[in-house]
Amino acid sequence: MLYYSMPALAAGFILDLMIGDPRWLYHPVCLIGNLIAFLEKILRKIFPKTDKGELAAGTVEVIFVCLLSGGIPFLILHILYGISVWAGFALETFWCYQLLATKSLKTESMKVYDRLKNGTLDEARYAVSMIVGRDTQSLTEEGVTKAAVETVAENASDGVIAPMLYMAIGGVWLMFLYKGINTMDSMLGYKNDKYLYFGRCAAKLDDVANYIPARLSGWLMVAASAFVKMDVKNAAKIYRRDRRNHASPNSAQTEAAMAGALEVQLAGNAYYFGKLYEKPTIGDGIRPVEVEDIRRSNRLLYATAIL
């Protein structure tokens, strides 16, 4: 089965670049998200509402989601490859195509670009709110642009490089397992009263799962900046200096490479759920952020993915 994973990865990646995610096609990550929400609701009723109880409930959730998100695709593919190699290859290619987010990331970020160029600031704020977790209602044009660029940078690892790496290692079932871990972190990994203990296991596991992919993505992005005629020396400098400027051990890896390549400053303070979070900046800000940086960030994303 693993013998066919690399050709399926190549075919799935090409399909992702060409087609992206059609809105009418149900996405498997939505199914994983529904599973996470369902299990959370059940487990919160079963376990006591104490710190230890929530930690235990969150750990049980992680175990179940990992078993189901990786195990079910593995079993389906194992059975299908046993029936027909071509059927197994076709499904593995299709799932790979669905789980990669290269074109959809470009499409969504370019909606922000379009609203900044041809619409109103409120429309741009709404467009960027669809792809970021921070509060966007009071963002300036520069703030909206930075948010879009940061999302492209961070998701270059989470949505493209990391899934490809895991599929190359173990096949598409391992890509599914990674997406299960990553989706749990995005839904449960908040450091607030509700998820501080319940989401701790999910957040820690996501840190582990992304440790190598994030660093690989950072260096790939530094190298890719040379192919799209960006500042490769500054990308390497800022990456080495600022790649730890984030509460997460992984999130700043590609943001630092992106900031250096574009010669801009990213990150900094942001509001989440009405509360100000003070965060260090990334990059020197050789020049101010401008709307065209969204387009440039996508060029760098594609170059990184192809490398």
Model regions: which residues?
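Hydrophobic alpha-helical transmembrane segments
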Residues: 1-177, 181, 189-307
